[in-house]
Amino acid sequence: IEFDLWADGYDKTVGISDEENTYPFAGYKKVLGFIFQTIMRAENAVVLDIGFGTGTLTAKLYERGCSIYGQDFSSRMIALASEKMPNAHLYQGDFSKGLVEPLRSFRYDYIVATYSLHHLTDAQKSDFLLDLRNYLKENGKIIIGDVVFETRKNLEQCKLKAGDTWDNDEIYFVVEELRKDFPDLSFTQMSDCAGVLILD
């Protein structure tokens, strides 16, 4: 429900935080730009977006000829994204329970999650990412853009700096801890609190 209420003003909220270079969305445009450039290296990629929101990133990929599949738990977000991408295959579903059935029938060049997986616990994140690997094509990649920290200490420093604006309901990625399950992951930092993770 909260994301339905937030849907109309979501892009605006993100923009303000990014321009001011403040948590949580500092580096947001850099993150999306980096992911966009990575995916555009492949021609007509098949992309699954987990928690696509209003379709900010996927609409750009859609315009460039990518086949777009997606799952989001907000019907309002799906309605907004469908306006931008009428031929995309978008499904409603809670990804804390995994992928919805129709999306399990396909294989993807890229599975993308931007600012969505921090709603899962660390254990849920690892389980979900391990499961998502089963839906990649050969040489496919999972790309995550989110609030990410190299170490637990970096996270604590950001939390201190953010003060009252810190969201205690969100559980952010810590690279050194995620490497236990995904030793080959690559991490590119985009701001004090944002980065891109790539898993093969």
What name fits each language-model region?
Residues V112:
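A conserved beta-strand element that flanks and buttresses the S-adenosyl-L-methionine
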Residues Y115-S116:
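Short catalytic micro-motifs in class I SAM-dependent methyltransferases
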Residues N44-G51:
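Conserved class I S-adenosyl-L-methionine
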Residues S126-E138:
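A short glycine-rich, Lys/Arg-flanked "PGG" loop and its adjoining helix->strand segment in the class I
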Residues I1-I39, T54-P102, I143-D200:
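Class I (Rossmann-like) S-adenosyl-L-methionine-dependent methyltransferase catalytic domain
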